[in-house]
Amino acid sequence: MNTLLSRANSLFAFTLSVMAALTLGCILTTAFKDRSAPVRLHVSRILLKKVEDFTGPRKKSDLGFITFHISADLEKTFDWNVKQLFLYLSAEYSTKSNAVNQVVLWDKILLRGENPKLNLKDVKSKYFFFDDGHGLKGNRNVTLTLSWQVIPIAGILPLVTGSGRVSVPFPDSYEIATTF
């Protein structure tokens, strides 16, 4: 009749088809879920320095430091198909030389099983907030936004922006303080 290899091939093909159908079912059950959540951001301190920029010509550039609070409940974002969330806080502003500037200031990976309720106080920016020039000094509209990338077990990777944003003005003068 059939050889052992042809029976094994049939079993493998059937198993692969069933696994593909189950994966498609997993994707369809969570593909259209709203993953947004309300976010509260508060900036408690802004420090602006004029520092040497070693990446280009020997000019000085603006370096901003931000201390902030984040409050968000991401519990409804997690379901059985979510492996982790990649959270990041970004700053968006415009200058004379660039219409749109976007800088990531802080990030965090939130795994399934960890506490999805964020209540972080006095968090300092994790990454440097450099502007290639002097676009931060006196800028009245630097908008901070918390966003997250949903990493599912199976399916697409949706990018979600939290509903809370905060716009902060930067100071008109540079700080001389040595520590932040």
UniProtKB/Swiss-Prot annotation:
What Gene Ontology cellular component terms go with this record?
endoplasmic reticulum; signal peptidase complex
Membrane topology per the entry is:
Single-pass type II membrane protein
InterPro entries (alphabetical): SPC3
Q: Which UniProt keywords apply?
A: Endoplasmic reticulum, Glycoprotein, Membrane, Signal-anchor, Transmembrane, Transmembrane helix
What processes in GO biological process is this protein linked to? fat cell differentiation; protein targeting to ER; signal peptide processing
Q: Work out whether the entry's keyword set contains Endoplasmic reticulum.
A: yes
Q: Where are the bilayer-spanning segments? A: 12-32
Q: One of this protein's Pfam families, by short name?
A: SPC22
* Cytoplasmic side, ranges: 1-11
Glycan-modified residues: 141
Q: Which residues lie on this side of the membrane: Lumenal?
A: 33-180
Intracellular or extracellular location(s): Endoplasmic reticulum membrane
PANTHER family attached here?
ADIPOCYTE-RELATED X-CHROMOSOME EXPRESSED SEQUENCE 1-RELATED (PTHR12804:SF6), MICROSOMAL SIGNAL PEPTIDASE 23 KD SUBUNIT SPC22/23 (PTHR12804)
Oligomer status and interactors = Component of the signal peptidase complex paralog A (SPC-A) composed of a catalytic subunit SEC11A and three accessory subunits SPCS1, SPCS2 and SPCS3. Component of the signal peptidase complex paralog C (SPC-C) composed of a catalytic subunit SEC11C and three accessory subunits SPCS1, SPCS2 and SPCS3. Within the complex, interacts with SEC11A or SEC11C and SPCS1. The complex induces a local thinning of the ER membrane which is used to measure the length of the signal peptide (SP) h-region of protein substrates.
Family named by the database record: Belongs to the SPCS3 family.
Quote the function comment for this protein.
Essential component of the signal peptidase complex (SPC) which catalyzes the cleavage of N-terminal signal sequences from nascent proteins as they are translocated into the lumen of the endoplasmic reticulum. Essential for the SPC catalytic activity, possibly by stabilizing and positioning the active center of the complex close to the lumenal surface.
The name this protein goes by in its record: Signal peptidase complex subunit 3
Q: Which organism is it from?
A: Rattus norvegicus
Q: Tell me the organism's taxonomic lineage.
A: Eukaryota, Metazoa, Chordata, Craniata, Vertebrata
